[in-house]
Amino acid sequence: MISIVWQGDHRYNVYRSGEDIGCITVSDNPCHNTHRYLNLGLTQYDPSISKDLFSRLRKELGQPLQIMLYSKPEMYNFLTAGGFERKRRCYELEVTSSDLAVPLIPAVELHAAQKGSTLYDTCCDLLYAYYSATHDTVSPLTVSQDVFCSDLPKTVLCSMVGSDPNHYAFVEPDETGYEIAYVGTTDFSSFSCFAQTLVHELFQKCDSLTAECDDTDPAAMQLMQLFNISIDGSYDTYILE
């Protein structure tokens, strides 16, 4: 028998047949506010209690539930037994040129634009639409374009068809090299050529690159395929509608 007791400060204590088995913290994300976010702090993850526990929380909170964590078999079994579905896997890349799967062929011209320029703003328009589309089936974007774009890196690299950008990447220096923070495209069929040119260009400036690649983002997956690396695990998103 599972019971949950609201403790204030965004926290529920969880009891199993009267025994305290930890707590669950609830939070909100203004960028994706159709879901309530859960952080699990339990002392046991027994799949036999999952359905009862999460049914109670879902009813109590009145919105779909979202959990994000590094997946392990124990947690996967616990969450799916409770009705959660793994909707997204995020792979964290930390790569150097020695990790390349194939020689790069830089075949497109890159244009750099800084925050405040017309080209930068156009790329922001495209990214907002692209990000919204690739996240809609996982956790819909719920902030305005102005708010979303206010936190983007100040530099975008893009390729053009005529006067219009078709592929783009928002990048910024980090502690070890460059982070490719966001990528997007209007044409998946030619994005790989852009990605090769992008990576080639950045490796002229630094020794290492980082990126987070969601399996729901086809452009990010094409970027990831440029590297021959073994990634241990992923940071996953689970949803209970």
Spell out what each predicted region is.
Residues 1-56, 162-190:
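Conserved donor-binding loop and adjoining core beta-sheet/short helix segment
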Residues 152, 157, 162-241:
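Compact recognition or signaling/catalytic modules
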Residues 45-108, 198-200, 208-241:
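Acyl-donor-binding surface of acyltransferase catalytic domains
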Residues 10-13, 36, 89-94, 155-157, ...:
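Short beta-strand micro-motifs in enzyme catalytic cores
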Residues 2-4, 8-9, 83-86, 153-156, ...:
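Short glycine-aromatic motifs
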Residues 6-7, 58-63, 150-153, 203-205:
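Flexible, charged surface loops at secondary-structure boundaries
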Residues 106-178:
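Flexible, substrate/cofactor-facing loop regions flanked by secondary structure
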Residues 1-6, 96-117:
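Conserved N-terminal entry element of GNAT/NAT acetyltransferase domains
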